[in-house]
């Protein structure tokens, strides 16, 4: 490995090394191990509003106990909320099953963490970064991209890519014993049947038992929502009104929120009471291998449903089509760790300017269990939907029966062309005409 290598495979002795520190077993053992091997560890913890984290202030103190030269808590919640709203505005969600999307909550969290922690490291003149991502997953590439995008001089050192670390502390039991042997009363928590990663926007559950497709959502304990599949869990129908102004969610049930963080947390509470936004997805990782995840995102789901209702009531068909196509492409870029790449910024600007700016109004929904809901009302000064335009009742109309006759007559041109093409395909043996064919009602007579 040359001195110019970006990825370091051995402990950088005598060098400052920043580590994304969660306070869990892996990063605690890694920090102490690096310290003992001669590195100068600096710990950086991102406050992403994780629903399963009770005491953020205690995490940097723990890092210092394990040997961190300096430990900092970086509040990333506002930036994460803004990026989440941007994803809603752009429809940046490319993974879905049965119409229920995955809201890319982990990729959004990585975009914020990767840039904000490396920025904090630069302030401390720390130019080597490590995190807990494994070589088989998506995060190792996401953090790599965002880290180098933020600091072009950054070097990467991950203990989990260092064979010496793997040989000495290759598993949870070894890491726990290592901490105990060094005087830390670390009690290894009981392993769950799956792994969970979360932030304010949502939670991801994957790996272990969830790698097997015969293990479903029911083995998992929700951390944002409720187990709506359990009959004993009482969930009463609830109406909720969501208000947008120029594409930005500003109010829930008439209560305005100046802080987007507070709005998303309240949306989580409302949607979470019903288990809204939970999904089970099979997806393609960046390396093209398939993986399976179960996701929670009640607040994102609530905002997405209301936003798309206004989109369909305000914009024309071609704009909606382009919004959806661009959203699929942008969602994939986000998933790949390219949220701040030029091609992503181009797609984001298009949606946020020409789609989102027109989205002002209120949508009222009735939430029931899981993703079962009904849209009760839609109001907006910008609606192009007008019931009177296509009313089935007798009255004034914007066009007459004769107008429609003329419009239909013009269709004769392309119908004739289509019929001719089908004849060509039939003659070429690509189509068969008659019973059981793709076009059974057509004959092969040319008229």
Curated annotation (Swiss-Prot):
Pfam families: Arginosuc_syn_C, Arginosuc_synth
UniProt-listed InterPro entries: Arg_succ_synth_type2_subfam (IPR023437), Arginosuc_syn_C (IPR048268), Arginosuc_syn_N (IPR048267), Arginosuc_synth (IPR001518), Arginosuc_synth_CS (IPR018223), Arginosuc_synth_type_1_subfam (IPR023434), AS_cat/multimer_dom_body (IPR024074), AS_multimer_C_tail (IPR024073)
Listed GO CC annotations: cytoplasm
GO MF assignments: argininosuccinate synthase activity; ATP binding; protein homodimerization activity
Keyword Cell membrane part of the UniProt annotation: no
Family matches, as CDD domains: ASS
Keywords, alphabetical: Amino-acid biosynthesis, Arginine biosynthesis, ATP-binding, Cytoplasm, Ligase, Nucleotide-binding
Subcellular location: Cytoplasm
Quaternary structure, from the entry: Homotetramer.
Listed PANTHER family: ARGININOSUCCINATE SYNTHASE
Protein name per Swiss-Prot or TrEMBL: Argininosuccinate synthase
Organism for this UniProt entry: Acinetobacter baumannii (strain ATCC 17978 / DSM 105126 / CIP 53.77 / LMG 1025 / NCDC KC755 / 5377)
Lineage: Bacteria, Pseudomonadati, Pseudomonadota, Gammaproteobacteria, Moraxellales
């Amino acid at each position: 490995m040359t001195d110019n290598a970006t990825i370091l495979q051995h402990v950088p002795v005598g060098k400052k090394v920043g580590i994304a520190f969660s306070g869990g077993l892996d990063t605690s053992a890694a920090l102490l191990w690096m310290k003992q091997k001669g590195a100068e560890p600096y710990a950086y913890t991102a406050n992403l509003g994780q629903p399963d984290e009770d005491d953020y202030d205690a995490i940097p103190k723990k890092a210092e106990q394990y040997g961190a030269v300096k430990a900092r808590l970086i509040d990333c919640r506002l930036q994460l909320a803004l990026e989440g709203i941007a994803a809603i505005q752009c429809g940046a969600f490319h993974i879905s099953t049965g119409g229920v999307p995955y809201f890319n909550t982990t990729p959004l969290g990585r975009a914020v963490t990767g840039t904000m922690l490396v920025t904090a490291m630069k302030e401390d003149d720390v130019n080597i970064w490590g995190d807990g991502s494994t070589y088989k997953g998506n995060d190792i590439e996401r953090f790599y991209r965002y880290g180098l995008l933020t600091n072009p001089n950054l070097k990467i050192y991950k203990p989990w890519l260092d064979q010496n670390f793997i040989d000495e502390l290759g598993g949870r039991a070894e890491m726990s014993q290592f901490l105990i042997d060094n005087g830390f009363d670390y009690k290894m928590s009981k392993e769950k049947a799956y792994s969970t990663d979360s932030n304010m926007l949502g939670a991801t559950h994957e790996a272990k038992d969830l790698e097997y497709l015969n293990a479903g959502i029911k083995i998992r304990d929700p951390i944002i929502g409720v187990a709506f599949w359990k009959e004993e869990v009482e969930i009463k129908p609830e109406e909720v009104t969501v208000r947008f102004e120029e594409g930005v969610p500003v109010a829930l049930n008439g209560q305005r929120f100046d802080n987007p963080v507070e709005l998303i947390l309240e949306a989580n509470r409302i949607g979470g009471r019903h288990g809204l936004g939970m999904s089970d997805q099979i997806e393609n990782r960046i390396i093209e291998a398939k993986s399976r995840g179960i996701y929670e995102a009640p607040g994102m789901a609530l905002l997405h449903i209301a936003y798309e209702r206004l989109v369909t009531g305000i914009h024309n068909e071609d704009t909606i089509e382009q919004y959806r196509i661009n959203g699929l492409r942008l969602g994939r870029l986000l998933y790949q760790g390219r949220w701040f790449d030029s091609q992503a910024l181009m797609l984001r600007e298009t949606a946020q300017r020409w789609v989102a700016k027109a989205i002002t109004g209120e949508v009222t929904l009735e939430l029931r269990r899981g993703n079962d809901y009904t849209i009760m009302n839609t109001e907006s000064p910008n609606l192009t939907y007008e019931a009177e335009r296509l009313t089935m009742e007798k009255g004034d109309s914007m066009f007459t029966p004769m107008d429609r006759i003329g419009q239909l007559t013009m269709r004769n041109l392309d119908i004739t062309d289509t019929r001719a093409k089908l004849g060509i395909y039939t003659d070429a043996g690509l189509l068969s005409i008659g019973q059981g064919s793709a076009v059974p009602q057509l004959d092969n007579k040319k008229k």
